[in-house]
Amino acid sequence: MFYGFDIGGSKIALGVYNAHRQLIWQRRVATPKDDYAQLLAAIDTLTQQADGFCGVRGSVGIGVPGLPIADDGTIFSANIPAARGRTLRADLSARLGREVRIDNDANCFALSEAWDDEFMQYPVVLGMILGTGVGGGLIVDGKPVTGRNYVVGELGHMRLPVDALRVLGRDIPLLPCGCGKYGCIEGYLSGNGFSWLWHYFYQKTHSAPEIIRRYYEGDTDALAHTERYRELLAVCLGNILTLLDPHLVVLGGGLSNFDALYDGLSERVSSHLLPVARPPRFERARHGDAGGMRGAAFLHLKF
């Protein structure tokens, strides 16, 4: 059995999956805010409950917001104060008496999609999140690629490509990013970026859902705005795909539900790739809110 924990700022969700990758049991509890001992105890209790339900000791995988440090599993996450700076992986492995694997929630999202029954045919899968921020994960042969510093897939912190100036204009401000740099694509491609660009070009203040509603109502500014955003997405994907060359790109996050983004996306991207390169398949994420715990559980699967 495979146990997947999705630990967020407000809740801990546990899903138990069988050998066929089917969800057979789940629980949810509140995340202890500032008490590390309570956090360990909550995970321990849920694990024991799952063991009791299954009649066997399952494997444990955990997805967290933030970046686990590759060397020792120390957690750096603003959303889980109780775990910040703690060696969660080592402490839980000792407490539970089994190997615990931890990865960030974006990698777990990508892993969940890569293990979809249909998507398993693709050796290299890129999960890209277009939500409050921009992030993602790279899956190769059923395993997340993490790199030296666990920053593989931090797509939002790539800088605007030169071709973006053609789309947005040479006077576009290089927005400051929370990472301390300027001009990161997250500032323009995220849901907040979608709204910021709307305000920048049209001096109107609306949320992304409101702009999308206007698009479907035929608002001319919303139509033009969506066209500009689609071209910007294609430009940014051109750099990412040239570097990673995935077979499949799965889009998640709130903006991934905007059907218009997929219109002609392959053709748009093709013009930003090498002449010999074919675009990957683009799909919307299929596993929704369950992706975090599902992907965490699958950290123990073998391709």
Curated annotation (Swiss-Prot):
The organism of origin for this protein: Erwinia tasmaniensis (strain DSM 17950 / CFBP 7177 / CIP 109463 / NCPPB 4357 / Et1/99)
Keyword Cell inner membrane: no
GO biological process: N-acetylglucosamine metabolic process; peptidoglycan turnover
Binding site for ATP: 4-11, 133-140
SUPFAM superfamilies according to UniProt: Actin-like ATPase domain
A molecular-function term among this protein's GO annotations: N-acetylglucosamine kinase activity
Catalytic reaction equation(s): N-acetyl-D-glucosamine + ATP = N-acetyl-D-glucosamine 6-phosphate + ADP + H(+)
NCBIfam families to which the protein is assigned, alphabetical: PRK13310.1 (NF009835)
Metabolic or biological pathway, per its Swiss-Prot or TrEMBL entry: Cell wall biogenesis; peptidoglycan recycling
Binding site for Zn(2+): H157, C177, C179, C184
Keyword set, alphabetical order: ATP-binding, Carbohydrate metabolism, Kinase, Metal-binding, Nucleotide-binding, Transferase, Zinc
InterPro entries: ATPase_NBD (IPR043129), N-acetyl-D-glucosamine_kinase (IPR023505), ROK (IPR000600), ROK_cs (IPR049874)
Functional summary from the UniProt entry: Catalyzes the phosphorylation of N-acetyl-D-glucosamine (GlcNAc) derived from cell-wall degradation, yielding GlcNAc-6-P.
One Pfam family it belongs to: ROK
EC number: 2.7.1.59
Protein name: N-acetyl-D-glucosamine kinase
Stated family: Belongs to the ROK (NagC/XylR) family. NagK subfamily.
